[in-house]
């Protein structure tokens, strides 16, 4: 979990100035500005980059609020507002946002079908009647035609639809002649086609009416079925088999929901993507809902509450949870205690479709829509999902307003007819198909000093390639360190990338098992020459960043693959015994911006470390010169004193003893030195040895 940064007033002023001068996103276009701002504010690069992202989210949320729209997921719950005013507010929001929307092909119409009329549980019937009357009046009013729309399109958008929807007790709503259209300015998805799930908040003491509208000739229709449930009562149990839910009459399903409609209500906001060119679904009366043979796993879609003040806490909480969420089939939300069950079944009711448990999804077998069981997510069977222009307009993207909570642990594969747009993979971690600018949260390996020494020893022995050339060395070091081979490959790839960024040539790989005979000789030489330890320490300290395994960047992954292929060709003779294709090499990727950030921080760290080592070397050299000078003075004094003693020159001896070097003046001459004893002992031992030899 990252710690929060507290900025001074001067730093905030500098950050704001850079933001106004174009530092408005986290892409490579603003990389230089972010770097300059980090240097000027004396902050870390990642801190400034995080500030830019937070600033974007704040400005996006602020613009959405100023334009008249409420944040996604919020509902008007003030008890003093009458139901008529509440419905009127919904229409005002719809008009204000529809006028300001760009109405491009990537930002389709969103139909508001959930009308929240707060009232006490005792006055629920009266508020229902008032809301129905006000809703009928609203439908009679005309909706202003949007610019750029022809008469035919306008009429097709507002086809009269009347539908009686069975909902909770005393909460049926008749939809009149007109529809309410709301175009969301803050898009739900980023340009990376992600699918999100949202958390739900419970709002007590408010009655909920729900209408479901499906209009033809539109690629996407979003509706909000609002489900009333009793907070204290027992949860509704979903049927074990979807066939029971699909063939049962709607009356029984409505009756099954009646026990949960007497007290506090829970508002759930669900968005569905409906089909464009298929006939409308018939809901209500005695007509059974159309059975769809959906084969596929479930996918929960939910939205956050849109509370900007709570964004940081949620982001940090999700970051800490990221490595732990693996295959949860159900989880509990702390605020509302909502249990999401990971089963292949769903209730059929207002605003719901029927799902059947299976494994594959066939678009031709799903004429209307596909429902993923745990929530109401309808994927269009014939809607083309373009990668360049996605479902929602990403101009005013509020990325952090929505929090992905994928609870499906099965394999998901969605295919459309037009573009064959596919989402495949094991969706157990919510960030696998998250925002494109958000890197996948992956486990990092913390190496100890001994592990690093072992890895560097194998690296110096030729373990410098990700291909099959170094397969034996990789397996050997993985077994020695008791880690997975992929972790070792990741470390090798990171070290290769660091060498390239620092301009150092990567040593050529060598095949076969590791041979440390040359390195043992080098170690013995370095032990005999301790003066070379300073140079080796610089090389060791340069690798301090290898303690954390960092994934490869997108920009270098292709280059890594090319280098692997080149190494495969160079060492083809060595690999005849155990050939392995380069396609089997796993390369973990992160964003280019993170690799740039890491490279710059590494270069700065290396330069500062090099300066420190140079200062240290200069200090040691000065100390050595001083010691040499002292040694020369002592040598001269000793030679002069010995000559004076041999010549029995008393005056010279007195002159030398009166002018002792500073080192000798500090010595204590009161105690007898052990040196004469040692000398006499050595002389006596030598004489005894000579005597024994003569005998």
Curated annotation (Swiss-Prot):
Residues 3-63, 440-503 bind DNA. Disulfide bonds: none annotated. InterPro entries: HD (IPR001356), Homeodomain-like_sf (IPR009057), POU_domain_TF (IPR050255). Residues 679-695 have a biased composition (Polar residues). It is found in: Nucleus. It comes from the Eukaryota. CDD domains: homeodomain. GO terms for molecular function: DNA-binding transcription factor activity, RNA polymerase II-specific; RNA polymerase II cis-regulatory region sequence-specific DNA binding. Residues 56-81, 653-695 are annotated as: Disordered. One of its GO terms (cellular component) is nucleus. The keyword Ribonucleoprotein does not apply. Keywords: DNA-binding, Homeobox, Nucleus, Repeat. One of its GO terms (biological process) is regulation of transcription by RNA polymerase II. This is Highly divergent homeobox.
